[in-house]
Amino acid sequence: MKSLCYLNQEDCFPAAHKALTDPNGLIAIGGDLQPERLLSAYQQGIFPWFNQGEPILWWTPDPRAVFQLSDYRPSRSLMKTLKRQTWRFTINKAFDAVIHQCAALRQEGTWITPAIKAAYGQLHAQGDAHSIEVWQGEQLVGGLYGIAVGKIFCGESMFHLETDASKAAFHLLVTHLRRFEFTLIDAQVMNPHLARLGAKPLPREAFLTQLAQLKHQHSPATAWQPQEVKLGY
């Protein structure tokens, strides 16, 4: 029988095969959200996910929800929306506002707690966490954020205040990642919304194999400089 690992401040994460099957992928509890631990977790295919008032819970589910960038195809309806809309798009221009909106739209029971906001804000400040923003004039109407681990982007959350704005942010993300030769987006846990966007389940072992190959392949600094971008069709 597998037992749950309780982390102290300096403990390392256990191997992925020691994760529980019920609940799927729970591998450890406790520890902290310091940047060093978070980056170590993502480099091992582990991420934090817990509600306000709970201890820190760490997960590595099997299977993993992923987007293979070579397989991504935007829907016709999204492309029509993009040609019709007057949105503008930026990268890393409003990280704090994006994560705030991602938390606000979930209201009660959000897992984007003040501790998560602070931790990922630190990762952003040191160049590891990134945001995509969609604007209508000067109003932020959609976006997403996540962590770059080598040539894998680990998506965390997205939001929209206008129809399809989060899908537009995702489309921009894919376009940008392809430009810099990323091959995979980690979406963590399958759900119907991700499936509609094109996510597929990937066995954990296969995901970890890809992660091991891609996590040391770094992008140029220009990839994540704050910038306004044009969305090609």
Swiss-Prot record:
Keywords: Acyltransferase, Cytoplasm, Transferase. One of its GO terms (biological process) is protein catabolic process. Coiled coil: none annotated. It comes from the Bacteria. It is found in: Cytoplasm. GO terms for cellular component: cytoplasm. It is an enzyme of class 2 (transferase). It catalyses: N-terminal L-lysyl-[protein] + L-leucyl-tRNA(Leu) = N-terminal L-leucyl-L-lysyl-[protein] + tRNA(Leu) + H(+); N-terminal L-arginyl-[protein] + L-leucyl-tRNA(Leu) = N-terminal L-leucyl-L-arginyl-[protein] + tRNA(Leu) + H(+); L-phenylalanyl-tRNA(Phe) + an N-terminal L-alpha-aminoacyl-[protein] = an N-terminal L-phenylalanyl-L-alpha-aminoacyl-[protein] + tRNA(Phe). GO terms for molecular function: leucyl-tRNA--protein transferase activity. InterPro entries: Acyl_CoA_acyltransferase, Leu/Phe-tRNA_Trfase, Leu/Phe-tRNA_Trfase_C, Leu/Phe-tRNA_Trfase_N. Its EC number is 2.3.2.6. Functions in the N-end rule pathway of protein degradation where it conjugates Leu, Phe and, less efficiently, Met from aminoacyl-tRNAs to the N-termini of proteins containing an N-terminal arginine or lysine. Belongs to the L/F-transferase family. PANTHER family: LEUCYL/PHENYLALANYL-TRNA--PROTEIN TRANSFERASE (PTHR30098), LEUCYL_PHENYLALANYL-TRNA--PROTEIN TRANSFERASE (PTHR30098:SF2). This is Leucyl/phenylalanyl-tRNA--protein transferase. It comes from Shewanella denitrificans (strain OS217 / ATCC BAA-1090 / DSM 15013).
